[in-house]
Amino acid sequence: MLNFRHAIRAGLVAATVLVVAGCATVKPEPNLVAFSTTLRGGNEVPPVMTDATGRVYAVLDKNNLLLRWKMTYAGLSGPATMAHFHGPAAVGENARVQVPFQRPITSPYAGQATLTPQQAAEMMAGKWYVNIHTRAHPGGEIRGWMVVQP
């Protein structure tokens, strides 16, 4: 009976070591870069008074420059008429459209686009933002700067 208990105990220890070792070797994919932002009216230039808010989460694959994103929003003054990634610009500046979102723009929304090397570098440098436009705010109702997540 003692040998059976010893064998069970040894088996449990070995299984625990394997599980811990397996977890220790799991690493995040080094070629994927995660971004996120919160969309607010106060981030627009000039600022917009609105109760609307939103979130954008994106992942850039540095191997093929494929950008995938998901966006949610609520509280807009009306239906979203357009949404885009803009850049390059510093925070507080406006920039040209880099990647337009396909219509219809609804929440939740998901999209993807292949970036140029220059676009990917600008996004990695924090020089891109997302904004959502409405009829009441044709210049954009809410905006957020894409930030690399650690």
Predicted regions: what they are:
Residues 6-10:
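N-terminal export and membrane-targeting signals
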Residues 11-21:
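Bacterial N-terminal signal peptides
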Residues 2-5, 19-83, 87-150:
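Metal-centered catalytic cores of metalloenzymes
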